[in-house]
Amino acid sequence: MKIHLLDPHTYSMVFGWYLCEMARKLKNGAEISHVIREFEKQMDCMEIVLGPYSLKQMKKSGRISAAAAVMGELMGIRPIITLIDGKTKVEAKVRGDDKVVPAMVELCQKRAGDVEDFEYMIGHTNIPQAADLEKACRKAFGKPPLAVFELGGVVSANTGPDTVALTYTGHPREGKNIRQRAAAK
């Protein structure tokens, strides 16, 4: 038995669907080397946008300071965070829960607006805003998500139990695949 290690440098919410697709292709007779290249090519394009509705867990996990969490909660500030190639970045800050979903969809459209084979998935921590995100995405992208699923403990440990996520096909990054970027670090 040969074992192939694949590290997409992201949460399982992104690569789980594509691992299942790989398994289907292999079961139907595809060559492993072709399937791995296809997987890496797909992962080189995937991006995540997270929308936490509270700063409490982000403070606990050390992502933000206690002072920033208190002030942010008092002012109703909600960060819009991307996770790309294992790096998190606050892309925007919106004021009020009702602005989280529109900001996430807008950021996705900005980053992936002209991607030819655009696909997306929605993750959530079983909160009502998940339905709002799905509805907004269907309207903005003109098609349903590949999947809608509950976020796991790793995401929740970092962003909290009240988070929605949008993962989508963006543009290929840096002209290098995952392995080349990891080796360069």
What are these regions (language model features)?
Residues 1-4, 10-185:
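Mixed-charge interfacial surface used for oligomerization/domain docking
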